[in-house]
Structures are given as C-alpha cells and as structure tokens.
Amino acid sequence: MIKSQKEYLERIEYLNTLSHHYYNLDEPIVSDAVYDELYQELKAYEEENPNRIQANSPTQKVGATATNEFSKNPHLMRMWSLDDVFNQNELRAWLQRILKVYPNASFVCSPKLDGVSLNLLYQHGKLISATTRGNGLEGELVTNNAKHIANIPHSIAYNGEIEIRGEVIISKEDFDALNKERLNANEPLFANPRNAASGSLRQLDSNITKKRKLQFIPWGVGKHSLHFLRFKECLDFIVSLGFSAIQYLSLNKNHQEIEENYHTLIREREGFFALLDGMVIVVDELDIQKELGYTQKSPKFACAYKFPALEKHTKIVGVINQVGRSGAITPVALLEPVEIAGAMVNRATLHNYSEIEKKNIMLNDRVVVIRSGDVIPKIIKPLESYRDGSQQKIMRPKVCPICSHELLCEEIFTYCQNLNCPARLKESLIHFASKDALNIQGLGDKVIEQLFEEKLIFNALDLYALKLEDLMRLDKFKIKKAQNLLDAIQKSKNPPLWRLINALGIEHIGKGASKTLAKYGLNVLEKSEAEFLEMEGFGVEMAHSLVNFYASNQEFIRSLFELLNPKSSDTAEEKQKSSSVFSDKTIVLTGTLSKPRQEYAQMLENLGAKIASSVSAKTDFLIAGENAGSKLALAQKHGVSVLNEEELLKRLKELD
C-alpha cells in the first residue's frame, strides 16, 4: 500500500527500472506476479489521487523503448497494452461495467500467449513491414527477420491496407531443443521462451532467426478498411488469408461461460504447445468497442485474465549471486531439481536480500517454488515446519562476486558500482555511446562486443585510444566504416556536461537529474550527500548513489573529464531555452494530435518545459488536439492558456 507522494514517486522509479530490465534488456529482475502486485498498488494510489499522476508513471506508458540496433518505425494505429484482472471479483466488476450499459454484449476469449507482439503491415497484398510493439506508438523494424518466420505469409489475398497483429512465440519443444544446442556449444542459455523469442526476432543476422523455429499467432488488427461487425469475424478472416488459427478460442455471453473457459485453459496449460500466462477477453461487437474507447494506456473493451502461478516444493542447496547489466546483484537459489509445468527447475530467483530477510528464507530450507506466468521460477516462502537444524542464514555479500569490488548496499538492492567490472562493462559502454549520453554514431552493442572480444577496450577511456588498424580487425569493417567510427568517437569530445554525467550510468541518475547536476558546474560530482539533498528533486537514494559512485570511481572520472573536457553548459541549447516562451513552464498535452504526444513532449522538454499529465491551477499551457475532453474544460476553468496544434507549431517555428 502506497501512503505518500514520496512513496509513489519511489514506486514509479522502481517499476520503470523493472520494466527496462524486462522489455529492453531481456533481463527480468522480479517475477510477473511481483511486478503485477506493485503495479496494482501504484494504480490504486493514482485512482485515489488523479491530480498527482506523473507523466513517467508506468500506467501512462506501453511496453518498451526501441533500442538502437534497428531503425524505429511508427504504427499506423497505436498498439495498446491490456489491463489485467486477477480473480473472479475483479473480472465480475470489469464485466459489469460493460454489461450495465451494453447488456447484450458478447465476449471473445482466447489463450494469452507469452511472447513478443508484432505488427505486420500489408499493402496491395504484399508484406511491407514488420514492427515490434515498442512503446505502442513506434517499435523496431524487423521485417527481414519476420520474413523468416515460416507461418507469416509474404503475400495475402487482400489488396487493402491492413495491419495484422499477433504474438511471436517459440514452442516449449523447440525452446528445449534450442537450449540444448546452446548448452552443447557452451553458449548462455535463454531464461525462458519469451526471452528466446525476443532475442531471436531481434537478431542482426536474419539467418539466425530462420533457424530458431519461431511462430506467429495473430490476435487482432490495427489499421484496416474491413467491413465486419464483429471481432471474431476479423479473426476468422485473418485465418482465411493463410495465418495460423488461435487454439481454444471461444465466444461467451456471461461471467459463468467465461469462467468455465478460463478453467479449461488452466487445465490444458501444462500440455499446451506454448507458454500461456492467462486468457484474453475482448468485446466481440465492434460498434461497442468503438463506443467504449480507450484509457491513456489500454482499451476499455478488453482485458487479460491472468493465470495463478504454478507451485511445487523443493530444497535450497546453495545460493549464487549474479551481476546484472546495471550492476544490480541478484541472489539465485540453487534447488534440488523439480518439474513445474513440463520444465525442470533447478534455480529460482530470490530477487534481492531485502526479500530474503523479509521472508526469512534460509539455506537448506524446503521452500514453495512457483513459475509466475509460467516463466520465471520464484521462491514464495520457506516451509518452516520442515526445519531440522541444518539451516543457515543467507548472508548479503559485501564484495562483487566478479570483480571483488565493495558493493553499494541500499534498502532493497545491492549494486556493484565498479565501472570496470567485466559483468557490467559492456552495457555501461553501450549506455555511454547512446543517444541520450554521448551519442556516438555507429558504436552499437554488437561493435562494443567485438571490441571486448578482441581485447581492444576495457572502459570508456579506451575508446579514445582506438586506431584505424584496431577497427579493421572487426567483422564487416572496411576503411570507410572504420574511419567514420573514429571520427564519431572524436566528435564526442567537449560534450555538454549533462551528457557526460548521464553517460556515466550512475544508479538513480537519469537525463533530467544529469541536467540539474550540470547547473552546478564541472566539480558537481565532488559534492557531499547533504549538498546533493539540497538540490531540487533529489532524494536520499540519489544522493547516496552519487557519493558512493564518485568514491568508487574517482580516478576514472577525473581522467575521463580531463580527456573529454566537457562544457559546463550547452551554450546553444541554453540560449534557445532561455529565449523560449515554454522555458520553465508546466505543459499538459491532450486529445488527438498529428504526431505522437511524446514527440511533442520531447520538443517542449528540449525548450525547457516541464511536461505534466494532469491539469491544475499551476499548469501554464494546455496543448489541445481533437477530442480534448475533460482536460480542456478543466484548463478553461483554471484560466490556463490553451493552444491548438496549429498554434503550437507556429510558436515552435518562431523559435527555430
């Protein structure tokens, strides 16, 4: 239960960290069940405090942010995420909200496959593009890889423009075979089928994708000009075009029928060919769908009825510590092997040491293990009645298991702050070169991996010592490409200070905090915890993280600053901000605009604006698109300046 705005802001930061690891890094920190519980508490707080909702809340966003490996591609119609329901009471309440207004509504129910959502665009019967969900507005363009998925037709018998959406999955059988191959080749195993599907779909070499035996199961449409009256008719039409049909699809009229089909799926889940984590429920009548509409994040006419976790009893025989890409230390329990949902489980995440202490889990305990969402094995609780005196306390580590560096121990998480730790070096450098950091063109993760394999770099300083002959050793590098990368690396010198601070990847310090820190000059990282706490928007965790990071990497930071010679301010950017009518103004965007809201939000933030999600007396501008609704009325009530899209574009043009 969240009791204060401070706890609310901390929960947002924590959930966004979990989402980043799950969607963008394919490196889950907690199980789906834990995330769902934390998310629902956040949602409950926001429902009670609608005027305090923050724009960066996960309730206001969909899915992942596109990575730098593939080009971004917009969806013609937004890809929404689904609201979850977890029990009969929640389902009954969801149904009643619809049936109260539309008593004759019917519902299409189908298995919720746990894979990667993909949007296929067909024009004149030809497959034009395949794009991952991404943030719902745009995703990664993976067309070449999608064409290697056997059951995706390259052409269809329909000449209109249509977006066909579905889930890319790998069957349980093919997943097991893939991991056996990787084991024999001494390659790291995939944690679960979802990660395998995601990693396979996002391969830069499409021949690898072809070998992975991915499947595409359609579940809906985006933009189209079909004239059907019912959702099920759309699905039947898609199957008639040559796509695979959804198994166990049913049409239901009431709560009882939906519950019966839900429990049928639960009984069948273990023998189902792919992993399931629930049942999708969608209003069948398309006119009712249109009238119900959407929230900011999800459709009101559909939901996901989540499955309960599968559980078994086994024994903890050991504990190891893994170092994630952010430096987070995750304790992992080694278990006596136990079969859950057709998979042999011999490890389970303990999440963090705070969780271990809270649940009083000990070495040699018999424990309850679940596979939440049929994916991540997790220990729920110890069976204390089985204790026989052989149990031992699981101790929180003091040094990194990889580099032996002293760890930063926070209330919940434990981190390795050493930038030179091999377990986190690669990801640190990928972040260092990323768009919101030093923005080094051509230096993506595959290039960085090659540089590590060739032992050409060990930290960010080594990038600036690379020579042409070094890069010529890399795969697919010729003189022009190598020289372009060297030029891009040199061009990254003399960056604005905030970019270099952000590039360091300090825990809890993102782009916004980096810009605040940069206002205090080149020696800002040498400040004390008390001085950091005096800065606007800085809490104890942020201050503590900054002090510990600088203490752990003082020599490296000084060398990097000396080499790159950052500018204490980005003169051109600051000049533009200071002259901007939007500088230091609070702005809310609402209604339908010709561009994604987040694109306008980014433009305005670059001009010094603060973007909020709700209108109040403190709001300076409301940018109102079509169908602006209640926010427009509230803005007029408070005397807030209202700009339509045309007026906004005119003002932005005046600032160029």
UniProtKB/Swiss-Prot annotation:
Instruction: Say if the entry is tagged with keyword 4Fe-4S.
Output: no
| InterPro entries, alphabetized | BRCT_dom (IPR001357), BRCT_dom_sf (IPR036420), DNA_ligase (IPR001679), DNA_ligase_AS (IPR018239), DNA_ligase_CS (IPR033136), DNAligase_adenylation (IPR013839), DNAligase_N (IPR013840), Hlx-hairpin-Hlx_DNA-bd_motif (IPR003583)
EC top class named in words: ligase
Q: Which GO terms describe its cellular component?
A: cytosol
Q: Which UniProt keywords apply?
A: DNA damage, DNA repair, DNA replication, Ligase, Magnesium, Manganese, Metal-binding, NAD, Zinc
Q: One of this protein's GO BP terms?
A: DNA replication
**Annotated ranges, domain BRCT:** 577-656
The family database entries (SUPFAM superfamilies) matched by this protein are listed as: BRCT domain, DNA ligase/mRNA capping enzyme, catalytic domain, Nucleic acid-binding proteins, RuvA domain 2-like
Q: Which reaction does it catalyse?
A: NAD(+) + (deoxyribonucleotide)n-3'-hydroxyl + 5'-phospho-(deoxyribonucleotide)m = (deoxyribonucleotide)n+m + AMP + beta-nicotinamide D-nucleotide
Question: What cofactors does this protein use?
Answer: Mg(2+); Mn(2+)
Query: What's its EC?
Result: 6.5.1.2
Annotated binding of Zn(2+), by residue: 400, 403, 416, 421
Which residue ranges run through the membrane?
A: none
Example of a GO MF term: DNA binding
| UniProt entry tagged with the keyword DNA repair | yes
| Residues at the catalytic site | 112 (n6-amp-lysine intermediate)
Q: Where does NAD(+) bind?
A: 32-36, 81-82, 133, 167, 306
One Pfam annotation, family name? DNA_ligase_aden
Per its UniProt entry, which superkingdom is the organism in? Bacteria
The job of this chain, per UniProt, is described as:
DNA ligase that catalyzes the formation of phosphodiester linkages between 5'-phosphoryl and 3'-hydroxyl groups in double-stranded DNA using NAD as a coenzyme and as the energy source for the reaction. It is essential for DNA replication and repair of damaged DNA.
Which family is this protein grouped under?
Belongs to the NAD-dependent DNA ligase family. LigA subfamily.
Q: What is this protein called in UniProt?
A: DNA ligase
